[in-house]
Amino acid sequence: MDALEDYVWPRATSELILLPVTGLECVGDRLLAGEGPDVLVYSLDFGGHLRMIKRVQNLLGHYLIHGFRIRPEPNGDLDLEAMVAVFGSKGLRVVKISWGQGHFRELWRSGLWNMSDWIWDARWLEGNIALALGHNSVVLYDPVVGCILQEVPCTDRCTLSSACLIGDAWKELTIVAGAVSNQLLVWYPATALADNKPVAPDRRISGHVGIIFSMSYLESKGLLATASEDRSVRIWKVGDLRVPGGRVQNIGHCFGHSARVWQVKLLENYLISAGEDCVCLVWSHEGEILQAFRGHQGRGIRAIAAHERQAWVITGGDDSGIRLWHLVGRGYRGLGVSALCFKSRSRPGTLKAVTLAGSWRLLAVTDTGALYLYDVEVKRWEQLLEDKHFQSYCLLEAAPGPEGFGLCAMANGEGRVKVVPINTPTAAVDRTLFPGKVHSLSWALRGYEELLLLASGPGGVVACLEISAAPSGKAIFVKERCRYLLPPSKQRWHTCSAFLPPGDFLVCSDRRGSVLLFPSRPGLLKDPGVGGKAGAGAGAPGVGSGSSGGGNAFTGLGPVSTLPSLHGKQGVTSVTCHGGYVYTTGRDGAYYQLFVRDSQLQPVLRQKSCRGMNWLAGLRIVPDGSMVILGFHANEFVVWNPRSHEKLHIVNCGGGHRSWAFSDTEAAMAFAYLKDGDVMLYRALGGCTRPHVILREGLHGREITCVKRVGTITLGPEYGVPSFMQPDDLEPGSEGPDLTDIVITCSEDTTVCVLALPTTTGSAHALTAVCNHISSVRAVAVWGIGTPGGPQDPQPGLSAHVVSAGGRAEMHCFSIMVTPDPSTPSRLACHVMHLSSHRLDEYWDRQHNRHRMVKVDPETRYMSLAVCELDQPSLGPLVAAACSDGAVRLFLLQDSGRILQLLAETFHHKRCVLKVHSFTHEVPNQRRRLLLCSAATDGSLAFWDLTTMLDHDSTVLEPPVDPGLPYRLGTPSLTLQAHSCGINSLHTLPTREGHHLVASGSEDGSLHVFVLAVEMLELEEAVGEAGLVPQLRVLEEYSVPCAHAAHVTGLKILSPSIMVSASIDQRLTFWRLGHGEPTFMNSTVFHVPDVADMDCWPVSPEFGHRCALGGQGLEVYNWYD
């Protein structure tokens, strides 16, 4: 070990920050964004690309940027150079920047000036800067000399929550101060008789019943807008505020936000507001809501900016995302809801069903059996036909495809189906399929080659009709191809269907929530044992018995694969096939991604919709390749984009318990429904897309609770595709720019996110997000890291198994596979497959003797996870979980994670367990020992010998038929009182001497480091290696009582000589080990508040180490040894 004086201290530098965006400002065709102390510069020039051109790091030191103020130029030209004042918290810095010819350059930078109070606003005054400070005072500052020229307080020295400075010279400077008394104080600093002489307020404006967070003044119209804690925006007619004694009139009291309003901005024709509800509203000056922009996640939108010449609104949120929206007139506007005025004396009867044949033709049927057509362009109703057989009960469905292929189908309660060509209704064809009621109709289209109509009758029989047209197009042919038989259920009919490319199978769904796979024609079933025929006469055309009395009276083709009750008893609402996957939606609020392998349906991933939208009605793939979800949120029809988390369209229709139809093309989107005896139609140009730009994707809407690095992918320079490489196998000559780290983060927002972190670009790419959890996700563990093709076939990419756990005692296991994809910005794509899940309350409900037991607390949370890989790979790993109910639980993962079973537990700690950590003890010529360490809120550590526990009862590893109660872990091998309060961080590292270095960090800011020896003792009654029992003993023990000023939430032993710790005090500290008590080496201030977890890993000898810190944001550091 080198001497202390010869050691080079690590120098940690920040390379990536993902924090809430707190400041935005448009400067010409550029956008300045403040993220922590960093400034992001985006190019908004339509002649080029919307992209980030520069990140200026650490511009404001350790302060958060809250605003930018641009010095006005005499010629008004800001396209080449700009002088910018950047302020936030108590810091101010002035920079002169140039971005001519697309190149960003910093020409001059002033020093960082620290004010004595919080800066609420800044304004340029003839080369100087006026600052509005937190206790109602104004400072005139000289940015060249760096000194205060004048400071004037107000007589009301109250705390401010916002302020606005108005005027271009000191003599006319006006401040509108938002006091904590919910009043606006208007006063004039230049009226002070002497320096530091207080000035009395000229006017007091009252009206809000909450703190005023933001205000904006429009000089051209004499309007002032304020945003408040009371969830309202007020518009005041104030005239010219630079003139004392003016009259103030409240001309608008705008309610539209469901939470506190953070920001407001007045434009010439609009008022923009944004708040805690993550909604940006566009108002008229009369207080009418014109547009609503939704897409950010989490706790709100923190910054807004506007580009009036381009009619843009830019928003920055707590989720670190930046989005650009088009104002009215620039985007695709919804044409609103219009009544089609069906009621007329010439159209008797009551409307029963409605459907859309494309986006401009609408069909409706009445209880008299009349079928009507409405042309949106002509705006006229036309009766196509009338059939008395379709009175009272009638189903109506239009064929899919461009403008409905000109076909629709009707069905009645007597088993009759009518196929109607819309252009020539006299050529309609009738077929009687069943002796009873037709329960449902659906179309299945395979390109332009094949069109099928499926009709469900009594007894679960589904008739499959093949529809074709004559060469003249004036006649159609309807031929029954075969019949299918659904599995028994209470409501035995299908709900939707779709062809599975290339067309050999049909994917159907039924009312009980099952997804079924049928052959598209009977001849495809070569093996009668697969799927098979249910009873005699299967596939025979004509009328079947179809009685619900059952038996085997009627037969049909059975499904070759079934996923029973996938969406629950509410049923499946849509089936869509795209990109080799099957997507299903249901009324359980979830949509599934399925995969067909060897004629069997396999679930891949279950995703939840937006909060509150439990009735999913459909799924569409838009031209850019992304998907949108259709559904009902209470009484509203919603088109939701899961990628951007945005509600693209909202129609107040009254709910889904009515006849409705949806159609979309690239040109337009239409939604029709019945309400109050009339047909209502909503149309929007541009289909299901919204012309907005995501300048930067958001990460998480709430705090990050865990960060876990999975592996490193090397981007091959000659091929431009990634290849998997373990960090320890990197060649000494490999360069950092080729490396991309794959990191998993989990959050309080119930999502698990997979990120790609390149080593050079200073950016993060969100590859995918998993939304299976119903509560917060607090811990993630990774195992089985490798390549997609396995060791024998090393394909480019990375694969791993992931276990996530959190609130409501819920645990999920899924696999990820990261593969090359040149079409994405990161050149990577991530495929996720959900494998298994487990919840403690569901486990207890399955017990036969549950009436004798106290049910597990449903509020139990998993605080930490650790993977313990056994010597027998066929058995899978163990997952240890630290639980808030005082238990340490062991779960067994089998069948590559598809079986997740509770194996054993212990309540040794008798209080909340915060951390678990597993490690192995390996000695030559001896068996590998598996050890587990747990830490609780009382500061105690417990060590468990898992190998001995499993040896004494080998049947534990065999999944029993009836698992009953879990096994007990017994007593720990060693207990240790390391701290006086809770332990939030824990890590171990083996030493060269065969011992283990153990370090822990506590809530009191202390560190505890000790050397643990594992000695093998042989039992007298045992023979062989099974009789070896380890004895754990502490050799050396050291403590650092005041290592940090707050909770130590991250700790990593990098080597036997160096350790790094992170704390809520926002310090990343390096410690020297190996010379007795740990000694301080170096410390770096990071910018993530309330850091909850940290992970460190070596990248390459040239690039050194990387460290990811997660809390209310994400920050990545790197350093060289």
UniProtKB/Swiss-Prot annotation:
> Which PROSITE patterns would you find in this protein's record?
WD_REPEATS_1, WD_REPEATS_2, WD_REPEATS_REGION
UniProt cross-references to SMART domains, sorted A to Z: WD40 (SM00320)
**Which residue positions does N-acetylmethionine occur at?**
M1
Which GO biological-process labels does this protein carry?
A: wobble position ribose methylation
Tell whether Nucleus is among the UniProt keywords.
no
Keyword annotations for this protein, in alphabetical order, are: Acetylation, Cell cycle, Cytoplasm, Repeat, tRNA processing, WD repeat
Where in or outside the cell it occurs: the entry states: Cytoplasm
Entry GO terms, CC: cytoplasm
Q: Name one GO molecular function term.
A: enzyme regulator activity
* First and last residues of every WD repeat: 53-97, 105-143, 147-189, 200-238, 247-285, 289-327, 335-376, 381-422, 425-470, 476-520, 559-598, 604-642, 645-684, 739-785, 848-893, 901-946, 970-1012, 1036-1073, 1079-1121
The text of the family note is: Belongs to the WD repeat WDR6 family.
Q: Give the protein's biological function.
A: Together with methyltransferase FTSJ1, methylates the 2'-O-ribose of nucleotides at position 34 of the tRNA anticodon loop of substrate tRNAs. Required for the correct positioning of the substrate tRNA for methylation. Required to suppress amino acid starvation-induced autophagy. Enhances the STK11/LKB1-induced cell growth suppression activity.
* Quaternary context: Interacts with FTSJ1; the interaction is direct, and required for 2'-O-methylation of position 34 in substrate tRNAs. Interacts with IRS4. Interacts with STK11/LKB1.
Matching PANTHER family, A to Z? Answer: WD REPEAT PROTEIN, WD REPEAT-CONTAINING PROTEIN 6
Official protein name in the record: tRNA (34-2'-O)-methyltransferase regulator WDR6
The taxonomic lineage of its organism, from the top, reads: Eukaryota, Metazoa, Chordata, Craniata, Vertebrata
